[in-house]
């Protein structure tokens, strides 16, 4: 899935035109303060390009959080983003208190030349996702006629459409696939992300190592399956390693994560790895805890000793880190999706931190290192390594689906060239 046959912003004539742009400003917030502005910064080049090339206006639309179609301005307003964007762009940003309807259409119909306008959270309307919840929390579906009206209103806000929301590219939501304008182009962030993944998956440097962490095997089955056709080596770490170790080594895992569904296909995955000549590295030792808690009592365990009843593994141990480091040293290209321990808690962060240090070291010797968004991107922010690896993806779910070999609806909807 690349952008090679799709219209991109650098080929779009924006002079004198109103540009309506879907961005991903779904940033982490604490008490209405933005805690990581990576996604806002990432959209700036596309916005600046439009302004520098004489666009009449740039109307920005995004979601934030999961309000499920209910307006929650106190919790999920994009207003703080307008303030942040103003300081990043060095110019005024007009914030509108809705994203569709007559007042919004009027404000966007004939704005002053060079205006930047940010709409309120798209997901305050159930028509964006097509489903949500009502005020009492019951599931609701959007009516088709109302979805049409919502999409028609968004389409009135610009003359051309740009999608730079890679983080939402795997969602067939109204703002991603339903804006009906003659020209629909991918923005620079979308282009950068897709080019990186296309190169990594279609013509990788070898040896190619995938590092897969996270909790559930079942969630990552398609990922493991698809990557086994592409890589030379694979590290399987994090919570899902316990399902592998229990099935393959009959290891005692205590109350560690065990995935019943995933367990059924562990042997199939391992035989595919063998058939494809992929070297698999699993953890051999662990930092354990007597409960899932930041301040739990901690212990050590190995695959041979097993994890005692009532205890769980929350990080890999030093021997595993050594094995992981050896795999990283052999690689010329690395794709990393999912942490190898509960990195949010100091006591269980060492394994992921040690691995990050090795990946940074590998990058400095010329290895291509790609971090699939989500938790692994958060690790980069936490340890300040975002500019010490080749590419940190802004999209967790979107990068996951690309690595699984899927077509992204948001990219599919762009104009062909």
UniProtKB/Swiss-Prot annotation:
Residues given in the record as CDP binding sites: 214, 219, 238, 338, 340, 343
Lineage: Eukaryota, Metazoa, Chordata, Craniata, Vertebrata
Record: residues binding AMP: 215-216, 220, 239, 313, 344
Effect of residue 88 to P: In PGK1D; with congenital non-spherocytic anemia; variant Matsue
Reaction equations catalysed: (2R)-3-phosphoglycerate + ATP = (2R)-3-phospho-glyceroyl phosphate + ADP; L-seryl-[protein] + ATP = O-phospho-L-seryl-[protein] + ADP + H(+)
Modified residues (Phosphotyrosine): 76, 196
One example GO MF annotation: protein-disulfide reductase [NAD(P)H] activity
Organism: Homo sapiens (Human)
Modification N6-malonyllysine, positions: 131
HAMAP family to which the protein is assigned, alphabetical: Phosphoglyc_kinase
Kinase found in the keyword field: yes
Protein name: Phosphoglycerate kinase 1
Effect of residue 378 to P: Loss of activity
Residue list for modification N6-acetyllysine: 11, 48, 75, 86, 91, 97, 131, 146, 199, 267, 291, 361
Modified residues (N6-succinyllysine): 6, 48, 191
Described purpose of this protein according to its UniProt entry: Catalyzes one of the two ATP producing reactions in the glycolytic pathway via the reversible conversion of 1,3-diphosphoglycerate to 3-phosphoglycerate. Both L- and D- forms of purine and pyrimidine nucleotides can be used as substrates, but the activity is much lower on pyrimidines. In addition to its role as a glycolytic enzyme, it seems that PGK1 acts as a polymerase alpha cofactor protein (primer recognition protein).
Sequence positions that bind ADP: 214, 238, 343
């Amino acid at each position: 899935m690349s952008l090679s046959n799709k219209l991109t912003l650098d080929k779009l004539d924006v002079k004198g035109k109103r540009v309506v742009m879907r961005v991903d400003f779904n940033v982490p917030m604490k008490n209405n303060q933005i805690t990581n502005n990576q996604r806002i910064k990432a959209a700036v080049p596309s916005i600046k390009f439009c302004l520098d090339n004489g666009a009449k206006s740039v109307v920005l639309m995004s979601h934030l959080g999961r309000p499920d179609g209910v307006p929650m301005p106190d919790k999920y307003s994009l207003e703080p983003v307008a303030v942040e964007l103003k300081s990043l762009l060095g110019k005024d940003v007009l914030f509108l208190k809705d994203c569709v309807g007559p007042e919004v259409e009027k404000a966007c119909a004939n704005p002053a030349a060079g205006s930047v306008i940010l709409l309120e959270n798209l997901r305050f309307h159930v028509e964006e996702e097509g489903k949500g919840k009502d005020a009492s929390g019951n599931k609701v579906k959007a009516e088709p006629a109302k979805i049409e009206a919502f999409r028609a209103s968004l389409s009135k806000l610009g003359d051309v459409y740009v999608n730079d929301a890679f983080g939402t590219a795997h969602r067939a939501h109204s703002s991603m696939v339903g804006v009906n304008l003659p020209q629909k182009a991918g923005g620079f962030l979308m282009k950068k992300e897709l080019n990186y993944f296309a190169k990594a998956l279609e013509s990788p440097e070898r040896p190619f190592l995938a590092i897969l962490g996270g909790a559930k095997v079942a969630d990552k089955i398609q990922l493991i399956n698809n990557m086994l056709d592409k890589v030379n080596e694979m590290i399987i770490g994090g919570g899902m390693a316990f399902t592998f170790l229990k099935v393959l080594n009959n290891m005692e895992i205590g109350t560690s994560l065990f995935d019943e569904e995933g367990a059924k296909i562990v042997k199939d995955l391992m035989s595919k790895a063998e058939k494809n000549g992929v070297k698999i590295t699993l953890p051999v030792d662990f930092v354990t805890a007597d409960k899932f808690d930041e301040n739990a009592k901690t212990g050590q365990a190995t695959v041979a000793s097993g994890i005692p009843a009532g205890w769980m593994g929350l990080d890999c141990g030093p021997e595993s880190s050594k094995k992981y480091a050896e795999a990283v040293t052999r690689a010329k290209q690395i794709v990393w999706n999912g942490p190898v321990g509960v990195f949010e808690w100091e006591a269980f962060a060492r394994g992921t931190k040690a691995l990050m240090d090795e990946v940074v070291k590998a990058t400095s010797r010329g290895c291509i290192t790609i971090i699939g968004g989500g938790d692994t991107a958060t690790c980069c922010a936490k340890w300040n390594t975002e500019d010490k690896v080749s590419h940190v993806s802004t999209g967790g779910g979107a990068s996951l689906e690309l690595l699984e070999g899927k077509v992204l609806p948001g990219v599919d909807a762009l104009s062909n060239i």
